[in-house]
């Protein structure tokens, strides 16, 4: 039920020599509920625990695994630790580790400006001291009215700790330093390491002197001076590190405007949505990695074509632009240009950064300042143009498929001449439906309303016809209600007011 219980249970688990013992707290578990990809991976969670402990055993067969897990469960229950002990194998166990791995990105989903910040996330102590250390850690945070995210390597005494602080405020900025100083002293008390897994760098380099002592720190300085007297290689990371709060992304107290957007961003504004990107780089996948995100990066292998780059450039200009219309920057347009609006990031990005939505919103404001390109108007009016073509579909299809006229149309419209243009079906779905005779079985089981978008109506009409016939044979009467166009063409080109 609590983090403390999980850490005490961890000590029991370690006696059985697991291959891994990892902590995931309730903050991350709550974030998984709002993430489409990770919501599927939390199937084993029962109730709303304060934390879960994921223990992995690798043995020769399942019988041996079961014998160990039965002993671990019995010992934990005997001392009142834990209430649900699912044992998972194979593909199901992979889902747990996928959820655990996504923890860092999921933390960006916390609503508002207060975020889980990596100020002291790498502390490590002797695993037997871990429960007491975390209790002391949380007492310090409680004193300052703060809470923290806890996750990761319980089995090795190295829990990632991220206090939730609003770095955009002067108060939050001051707390950032205060927490770093007080936790560094606490780690020293437990003879631990302030950077148990990753480097010290600009964030924790300031505290190396305190961690290793004056004599050892001087040895580090002498070593640096001997082999790199000009401080060429990675300067100011281990020795002579500047104060940890002098190079922050946000200027404390800096005011950002209230953005009037056409889309609604749930519990946040557009800047806060862009700020959800924490730079984890899940969008830098190749086609061999599986998944969709991000197709433009898979093709170009250029950082500017990643989900991360698009979120970052929008965040930068919305925060620091001097223009009244902060979207009016060619640099943003160039980075957004190759986004396919495939929505892969909406489900696969652990931080749920929806670049397709961000791009559409950006384009509308950019067009407000710079006008709408002819090609975008053409695509936006796809339904109207298809309606005109549907009056004489055979003539339309001849024009777009003929090498001369088709090439001319593409050049005028601004399409690549190698691309094929969509053709029209011989009739529209709505016209066919109006004249067709319903199946004798239709209506025996009820009624279905079929919403016919412009693409099904004009292009993929056979799919619509097959759907109607199938539903009627299954016993449903079908009705196609009058409704507006889907607006997808307008939205895809950023003309969201029309969409």
Segments predicted by a language model, with ranges:
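Phosphate/adenylate-binding glycine loop and adjacent helical scaffold
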Residues: 200
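Noncatalytic alpha-helical scaffold of FAD-dependent oxidoreductases
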Residues: 1-152, 157-196, 206-288, 295-298
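Secondary-structure capping and boundary motifs in well-ordered enzyme cores
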Residues: 129, 150-157, 172-175, 179, ...
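Ferredoxin-type iron-sulfur electron-transfer modules in oxidoreductases and energy-metabolism complexes
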Residues: 246, 250-389
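Iron-sulfur-cluster electron-transfer modules
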Residues: 110-114, 323-499
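Active-site-adjacent "gating/activation" loops or surface patches in catalytic cores
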Residues: 143-146, 159, 309-312, 440-449
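Hydrophobic alpha-helix feature that most strongly marks membrane-spanning transmembrane helices
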Residues: 14, 18, 77, 142, ...
